[in-house]
């Protein structure tokens, strides 16, 4: 089976303007599977916590894909997963829905514990009104997720985000 290699570098524009890297990546390997997750923070002042959103997305994707992989094996669902159709769609949708729901919970809990600072609010000119109304608060942590799960039987790739 393949080896997973991970590298994360801060872009030259971010270095030049002293902007933190808003991206994150993680890998996990076991005897039965290899998992990777890469999250690309939005790089927008209206999303001042993209760095945290990316970290949460990767951590949750890795965790949920571990559970997914185990469930597929324990329930003998490999054939359902690799055969195109309703069962395949349902299994993959459940995985993505679980990742998004847990990410949304994580960012909402983090925001409740650490409300936006005045400095963060000052950069959120486009969306500050809706943030003040408590709407679309997850956008503060905006990120796009790409993740993969590799086993001896299948490679599953998912992408979530950038649905503008």
Task: Tell where the protein language model's regions lie, with residue ranges.
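PP2C/PPM-type serine/threonine phosphatase catalytic domain
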Residues: 1-164
């Amino acid at each position: 089976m393949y080896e997973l290699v991970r590298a994360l570098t801060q872009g030259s524009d971010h270095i030049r303007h002293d902007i933190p890297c808003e991206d994150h990546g993680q890998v996990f390997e076991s005897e039965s599977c290899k998992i990777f997750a890469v999250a690309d923070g939005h790089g927008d002042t209206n999303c001042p916590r993209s760095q945290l959103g990316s970290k949460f997305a990767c951590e949750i994707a890795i965790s949920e894909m571990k559970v997914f992989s185990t469930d597929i094996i324990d329930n003998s669902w490999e054939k359902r997963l690799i055969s195109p159709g309703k069962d395949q769609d349902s299994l993959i949708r459940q995985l993505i829905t679980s990742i998004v729901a847990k990410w949304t919970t994580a960012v909402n809990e983090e925001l409740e514990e650490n409300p936006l600072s005045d400095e963060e609010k000052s950069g959120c000119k486009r969306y500050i009104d809706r943030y003040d109304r408590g709407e679309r608060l997850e956008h503060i942590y905006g990120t796009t997720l790409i993740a993969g799960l590799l086993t001896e039987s299948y490679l599953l790739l998912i992408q979530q985000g950038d649905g503008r």
